[in-house]
Structure formats: structure tokens, C-alpha cells
Amino acid sequence: MRLYKMELFKLFQNKIFKIGMLATTGLLFLYFWFAEVGGEISTVDGKFYSGYEAVQMNRKITEEFEGDLTDEKVNQIIEKYGLPAKLEENMPGWRDGNFLNDFVTRYFTNGAWENGVLPTERYFLWETELGKAYDEIGKTPYLAYTTGWKVFVEMLQFGLILGSILIICGVSTIFAEESQTKMLPLIFSTEEGRRKDVPAKILASFTFTIFIFMWFVLVNFVLCWMIYGLKGFENISWMVLSQHMLQPVLFLKYLGILLGLAFQALVSLCAITLCVSAYQDSSFGAVIIVAVCWGLPVLIRMFFGGIIWLIVDSMPIFLVMTGIVNDIYEIWYIVLGINVCFAIGCLVKGLVSYKTKQFA
């Protein structure tokens, strides 16, 4: 336990970690405020709102209609707010819409701002793909201001990419630094060092990784809850995220799979980093090699398919991407299994390499 605490202290007291934690958290705040909140727009009673004001206005008008979604409620929204019809070149979304009539246009008309198609036809709930999806699972759609969850999922990917960088920079030094500073002979000269040094380093590294995962998830959750609110989680993910999925999946199930894959992504990245660190005699060299290993699957995926595609999708950089659940939903447990086996293999390989140095 003493060695574990010492290793954990070294990881958290590292200047690179302290500076990196402040920088990445700051970047997360900036991205949230300027890219997410700053991009919100809403038009109510002819008045245009943007940024935080738009969020507040959208939340306010949605409260009036919150509840089970019916054709009558859709008609009331259209009567009160109309349907949006204004588009601007190279600008996303309806420029004269709000959360409610944007929602109605997307699911109950033929309008689609992505394709520049104005709404000209109106559909009943039972005629829509949304209605059919809910009939398939035997539930009723619940109208609520779900943008908070949509932003949470978008922010999660950005936050965990930043967290991955912190893990690479922090954990890469855990073994390599001992070789670089010529401390290995001293560590292995004691009985405690020979028996407990490696388990302490590994346990400290995974604790460090779990902390980083929880930090970015928690910060993201609090930001979205405070500004957007987090309602509508009882719906299917398609309705919450405005992204079509091949089959209706409840958002909570989608979120559970997403967080589980993201957690395993960071844990496996930690295992890969430990393996490289055990082989390297330089902290800088370890960081560079791990960074290359982390980003290389993106390049491989561009040129290969088939079984290679499946293996590449199980790598850490892809498991933190929000679109991964839709891509691998039918086989997510296979992808997770590949990742777990790969992580265990890396950890064992690194452990053997580091132990070999004990007898060198």
C-alpha cells in the first residue's frame, strides 16, 4: 500500500499532469460555451435569440408541452409557432425555428434543413418512422427538452479524447522513467521492490485512469445539467440525439453502452501505455510511441475493411467516439471482448518485459 500511494502521488504531482488538467478542463469549458451553447438559436413570436438566451427560451416554451407526445399536441405547436422556412447558406438549422417547431418539422413533415427541403407535407404520429419505432417497443414518445443529453454525448467524445492525451502523457513515464533515471537496480535490490513495485505501478496507473474518466464525465454532466437540463432520457436514442439508428434503442441503454465502451477505451489505453513504457528507456520516447499507436487505427481504417475494420473499431481511439454504438450495436460485446483481450495481452507483455530487466 505504501508503494501504491507513492506511485499515485507521483502521477498526480507530475507538473505535466497539473498543467494538462487545467488546460484540458479549460478547453472543455471553452468548447461547451462557444461551440455548443454559442451555436444555439431560437425564434419565438418573431424575436430571434442566440446562445444562452436561446437555450433558456427553448427550455421555457418546451415546458408548456412537456409530456406524452400526441397528434393533438403537435397541432397545438404548429398553431402557436408555425413551421420554420428560413435557411441560410453554409449555416446549420432553420434560422426562424425553435426547439418545438424544429422537432415537429424533423419528425412530422417532409422538411429537412440538411437537404434544403422546406416542410410542405404533414404526417400523423402513426405514419412517421418515429411512431413506428415506438410501436415496435410498445412505448409512447415523451416530449421534453432533450438537447442537454444530445450535448452531453457530443461533449463526452471531446472530453475523453482530451483525457486520453492526459493518460498517454502521465502513464508513459511510470516504467520508462525508472530506466531513464537508472533507478531500476536500486528498486530491484530490495525484497519489497522486487515483489510489490510492479503491482503498485499498475494499480496506481489504473486508478489514475479511472479518475480522469470520472472527472471528464462528471464535469460534462454538471455543465449540461446546469445550462440545458437533462430531461427526456426515457425516450429512444434516435429521438434524443436526432440521429437515426437501425433499430429503436432506449436512450438509457444507449448511454450505458456508450459509457461502458468509453471506460474500457481509457482502461485499455492505460494498458497499452504501460506496455510501451515497460519496453522504453526514455519517457519522451514512450510518449511518442504510445501517441502513434493511439492514432494509427484511424489511418488503418481508411485503407482496410473486413475483419481489420472490426479489430480497428475495438481500439481505444474509436471506442470513445459517439457514433461507435450505432456502428457496432449488434456486435458491441464482440468489439468489447476484442478490446479486453488486447488490453490484457499488452499488460502481460509489458509486465514480462519489465520483469526481465530485473535480471538484466
Residue ranges of predicted features:
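Short, membrane-interfacial amphipathic segments enriched in basic
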Residues: 1-4, 141
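Secretory targeting signals
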Residues: 23-69, 101-178, 199-279, 317-336
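Residues that define the loop-to-transmembrane-helix transition and helix capping
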Residues: 15-18, 195, 283-284
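Central hydrophobic cores of alpha-helical transmembrane segments
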Residues: 21-25, 284-297
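Membrane-interface helix starts
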Residues: 8-23, 289
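Short helix-to-coil transition segments within interhelical loops
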Residues: 188-194
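Juxtamembrane non-transmembrane "cap" segments at the membrane-aqueous interface
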Residues: 226-237, 296-315
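Junction motif at the cytosolic side of a transmembrane helix
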Residues: 5-14, 275-279, 341-360
